[in-house]
Amino acid sequence: MMGIAADNISDGNNISNLSFVKFNKLYSEKYNTTLDPNLGFVGFAEGDGYLGINEKIPVFVLTQKESKILYEIRDTLNFGYVKEFDNFSRFIVRDKLSILLLFHLFNGNLHLKHKINQLVESILLNSKNDNNLSIITEPVKLSFNNSFSGFTDAEGCFNVYISKNNKGISLRFIVDQQDGLSLFNQLKDILDSGSIYARKNNNYRFAVTNINKLVLVIDYFNAYVLRSKKQFAFEKKVIYNCVLNKEHKTLKGMEKLKELSYLVNKDND
């Protein structure tokens, strides 16, 4: 059984880049190939995944309404399985070697303290230390890469709000996360824009509504493509240019924007 001693925990100071060297070394030994972990899975897993203990063994569970992306993850990683329920599906990993692979994939590459704590607790609850693992407990600094794209697939959305009098329109990029204050402060610094809202149960929301700052969000997702159906919402980004050109000031333009807003909001469910 995989385990770790408490003194094998590192604070990993000044971490700013994702690292997958140990993961790819172990992965290549098992599958005779390497995998590009920058596919966004780490961010997606950090947003919606759970690593814990079930029946005294570590288990990783990723829950999603959209089963298609879970099957893509399974086929890309070459391990785990997908179980479908009535209104959602789960990607599940239980075997020892695959959990070890996930450990190296996540270790030092997570942004949220409570997700790092899951990693610590799930490993520390195992009595042996067969693999001599060291856990990095310092959150990695946020940077714009595929990991944040995956995180947005899990926890973000694009939203269009049209006022009741049909005269005003607001475009929003939103990300929600429990214990997300530190992460969202970094995101606000990177974008030099956005607002952070405290919600119930230590949940936080980050939102960008400034039309001039949204171009930075658009540029990012042009470079790092979303893998969920939220990509379909993003592809309606022509609405941004319509608002920038004040097309909503005309009756014809507002009707066009209403149609686009329906499509954007629909693909964020």
Predicted segments — roles?
Residues 1-269:
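Internal intein/HINT superfamily modules and their associated LAGLIDADG
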